[in-house]
Design a protein with these regions (language model features):
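N-terminal leader/targeting and accessory segments in enzymes
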Residues: 1-90, 94
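Phosphate-binding loop of NTP-binding sites
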Residues: 11, 88-151
Length: 151
């Protein structure tokens, strides 16, 4: 579970103006269809999508607050940042610094997902399975790494 954070704490860490009202969350979600009450919606943009188009939907579904880029209209539940991608990276780095467990990274051109599954299975046989985390699917890129750290 992600550390609990608020729009005010995040604004302070990112050297942004402190929002007047505080909203707290412990989960980052980037798909507005998967928002639960209290989640924080991070409006990412890509070549084929723009999370900013779904901010209203995320808030209607119960998002505690939204992180958007500054060029999007702001209100008390929307924290504007220079780049939502950089904010995602910042949150993942912040979470990683707080984690004190052992981390195993698997690299290479081929076989990463198979190796991850095998290693996870072996470690789960030897240790408490609830203490073993393996990223879902093939989250072996920037976004997968960030989302793994924030899960």
């Amino acid at each position: 579970m992600l550390f609990e954070f608020s729009n005010q704490i995040l604004a302070a860490k990112l050297n942004l103006e402190k929002p007047k009202k505080e909203f707290v969350s412990s989960k980052i979600v980037t798909d507005s269809r998967k928002i639960s009450n209290g989640d924080c919606f991070l409006a990412l943009k890509g070549p084929n999508f723009n999370g900013h188009d779904f901010i209203d939907e995320a808030l209607n579904r119960g998002a505690s607050f939204v992180i958007s880029e500054k060029n999007h209209p702001q209100d008390e539940k929307i924290l504007g940042v220079d780049s939502t991608h950089e904010c995602l990276s910042f949150l993942a780095k912040y979470q990683r610094k707080k984690f004190e467990g052992k981390v195993i990274g698997i690299t290479g051109s081929n076989g990463k997902t198979s190796t991850k599954l095998l290693l996870s299975s072996l470690l789960s046989d030897k240790f408490d399975p609830s203490q073993i985390y393996a990223s879902p699917g093939n989250w072996n890129n920037f976004y997968g790494l960030c989302f793994s750290l924030l899960e």
